[in-house]
Amino acid sequence: MSLLSKTRELNTLLQKHKGIAVDFKDVAQTISSVTVTNVFIVSRRGKILGSSLNELLKSQRIIQMLEERHIPSEYTERLMEVKQTESNIDIDNVLTVFPPENRELFIDSRTTIFPILGGGERLGTLVLGRVHDDFNENDLVLGEYAATVIGMEILREKHSEVEKEARDKAAITMAINSLSYSEKEAIEHIFEELGGTEGLLIASKVADGVGITRSVIVNALRKLESAGVIESRSLGMKGTFIKVKKEKFLDELEKSK
């Protein structure tokens, strides 16, 4: 397969995910397929965002890493010290992705490391490993292209998260501001009683405790539910099950006191 064909295969995957979050496992599998390598896509904190492995599954340490979805902190630190592509790293180098304890299995192995950059900052690392055969120039071009694309996707996800947090905060603020004084007091008392983000509410108990009518509690909950801040489900005589949908709600409620 030519370099152009390999690049197109990676582009096809990204176009398939247009408008939705990219699954980095799919990205890793595509990179693995076109480069015939073991692949790790790692965040700057060492979280494994995506991987596609073959020969490395012979190592118990690698299997454990995959289960934990995290690489060791010391290896993460070493990766973050790599500022530009480093290719054809052998088994005796501390940057090798292959386990040194299985040196005899991976004596001819080669590791290549591509820093993932975006928006002027380091976002993670793309690590490719081969049991045999050096990485050639075409491999490096494809790897650097893949690292660039991954960086763009990580940035897009980060921006989406920031936008979602802003929307959630606005919805929470509007919901809290829509409550009357007595409704807000009722909501504060409800979550003090629950002691967390979800639990069972007995409206009559709260009404008696705060000294308000049950209808005030019902109206307050209805306002929060219509704003998408909480969800509730009647359990009949047992009460009402309440769950917070927007995680910053309780913090914002506390700040508004």
UniProtKB/Swiss-Prot annotation:
The keyword Repressor applies. GO terms for biological process: negative regulation of DNA-templated transcription. Keywords: Cytoplasm, DNA-binding, Repressor, Transcription, Transcription regulation. This is Global transcriptional regulator CodY. Residues 1-155 are annotated as: GAF domain. Pfam families: CodY (PF06018), HTH_CodY (PF08222). It comes from Staphylococcus aureus (strain bovine RF122 / ET3-1). It comes from the Bacteria. Residues 203-222 bind DNA.
